[in-house]
Amino acid sequence: MPQRIVFYFIAFVVLASLVYYGFSRWQDSRLKVDLWTLVPETAAFVVETNNHSELREHLEETALWESFSLLPVTQRFQENMAMLDSVAPGNQRLDRFLDKKNILTSIHVLGKTDVEFVYYIPVVSVGEHRFLRTLTENIVKSPAFTEQSREYQGMLLTDVTNTQLGTSFTYFSYHNNIILSASPVLVEEIVRRINRGKLTSIAADYKKVNYLSQADVYANVFVNYRALPDLLGLFVQEDLMPQVRYLSSFCRNAMLELKLDRNKLFLNGFSNPETLEGSFQAQLHPSKPRPLEIKLLLPTRTAMLMHFG
C-alpha cells in the first residue's frame, strides 16, 4: 500500500510538472510583443506598413523605385524572396503571408559602408504557423539552400544560405514573431536587447500616433536624426559631413506619414527638437528678450527698420 501511494504521488508530481510546463509555454506563445521595442537604437529609419503588396506595387511605378532597386541590398532581397517563393508550399505564396499585417522594417548602417535591413513579421494564426513550418521543411529539402541552427544567449538562431546566389539571412522566432535580417550582427544585437529586459520603444514619443488608420496612408515612417548622418554619409562627400551632422541635430526624431500619388512621394508629421548641448536646435533656443532702445532715437518719419541683434 505505501509503495502504491508513493507511485501515485510521483505520477501526480510528474503530471503536474508537465501541465505547468505546457501552460507556461502556451502562455509565453500568447504573449503579445510590441515590435517597436525590439528595434535597436541604431536604426536610422523604421517603416511600418499594413499593406505590403499595395505599397510595393505603387512604389514600382515610381522613379524612386528605379533608383532604390539599384542598391545591392535591394537586389539581394529581391533575389532571396524569389528563391524563397519558389519553395513556398502550395499556392500560399510569400506575398499572401506578408500581406494585411503590420510589418516593421528597420534600416541600419554597418561599418560606415553598408546598409542593412531588419524585418519584424508577426505570425497571427495557426495557418501561418503551418505555412512557416512547411516552408522551413522545404528549405531544408531544396538543393538551393543550406540551413544551420545555433544557440545565441538562449535564443535559437537559424542561418539560411542561398548556395546559388551566395547570399544568406538569419532569423529567429520570438513570441509569435519572426525577426529576420541578412546581417547576423543585427539579429544578435536584437537578442542581446531582449535579454537585457525592460524593453522600450524607439518611438515611445509617438505611442499614440498611427497614420495607418487614415485613408491613402501607406506607412508610418520613424526618423532617428541621431543615426541619420551615418546613412547620408553613404551618399555625401566627407568634407560636407560636419554640416550634415550639424543640420541633423535640429531634431531628435520624427514620425511621418507616407503617401504616394503617382510619381510623387509625400511625408508629413511631427518632429521632436534635439535637446543635446551644442546641437543646432540648442543654438536656436530663444534667449531672454531685451528692449530695443534704438526706437527712442528713430525719427517719426521712419517707414521701416531692419534690426539684426
Positions of PLM-derived features:
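Structural boundary/hinge residues at secondary-structure and domain interfaces
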Residues: P2-T161, K207-C251, L265-G309
